């Protein structure tokens, strides 16, 4: 499994660089969100991506036999980097391959406090990536770095 968490401005070159090293059936997890900072703007807005989302762009750039999953887009890096605290966020997992999503949901389950939800096809990344900009805005407004999402009224898939 390869996890891509780079600024949007670096996504294209990163995908081109790793493409020759990827193996058939390998899972690539895209965490990148197309924030406006990629073009000198604000982190509370996204830029429109021709493919629909950063995940769909990444998928187009990958070999057809590599499985793209979008996940962790709405989880603060600050939380994921602090191994002494439970994450206490939900992770929305999108992709077009059920087995690849199940593998990523298993990874989510291994993170203390995190819960994973199968959020459907990679197309749904369009909405999920937009939520990240909103979360950045809320975190700034409330002076925190770790605000995230919790889905209520249903059981997680992980």
Show which residues each predicted segment covers.
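Rossmann-like NAD(P)-binding element
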Residues: 1-29, 33-41
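Glycine-rich beta-alpha junction loops
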Residues: 10, 32-35, 75-76, 97, ...
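Active-site phosphate/pyrophosphate- and oxyanion-stabilizing loops and adjacent acidic/basic residues
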Residues: 16, 56, 60, 106
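Short, structured coil segments at secondary-structure junctions
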Residues: 24, 62-64, 111-112
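General beta-strand structural signal in soluble alpha/beta enzymes
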Residues: 29, 67-73, 116-119
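Short beta-strand and adjoining strand-loop segment in the mid-core
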Residues: 41-51, 56, 82-99
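Rossmann-fold dehydrogenase core element
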Residues: 48-73
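Active-site-lining helix/loop region of Rossmann-like oxidoreductase modules
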Residues: 88-158
């Amino acid at each position: 499994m390869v996890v891509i968490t780079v600024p949007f401005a670096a996504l294209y070159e990163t995908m081109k660089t790793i493409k020759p090293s990827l193996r058939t059936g390998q899972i690539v997890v895209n965490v990148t969100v197309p924030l406006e900072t990629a073009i000198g703007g604000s982190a509370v807005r996204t830029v429109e991506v021709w493919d629909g989302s950063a995940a769909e762009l990444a998928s187009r750039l990958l070999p057809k036999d590599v499985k793209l999953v979008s996940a962790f887009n709405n989880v603060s890096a600050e939380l994921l980097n602090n191994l002494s605290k439970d994450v206490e966020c939900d992770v929305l997992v999108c992709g077009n391959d059920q087995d690849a999503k199940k593998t990523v949901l298993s990874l989510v389950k291994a993170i203390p406090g995190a819960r994973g939800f199968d959020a459907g096809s990679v197309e749904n990344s369009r909405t999920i990536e937009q939520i990240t900009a909103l979360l950045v805005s809320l975190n700034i407004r409330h002076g925190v770095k770790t605000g995230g999402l919790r889905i209520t009224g249903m059981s997680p898939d992980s």
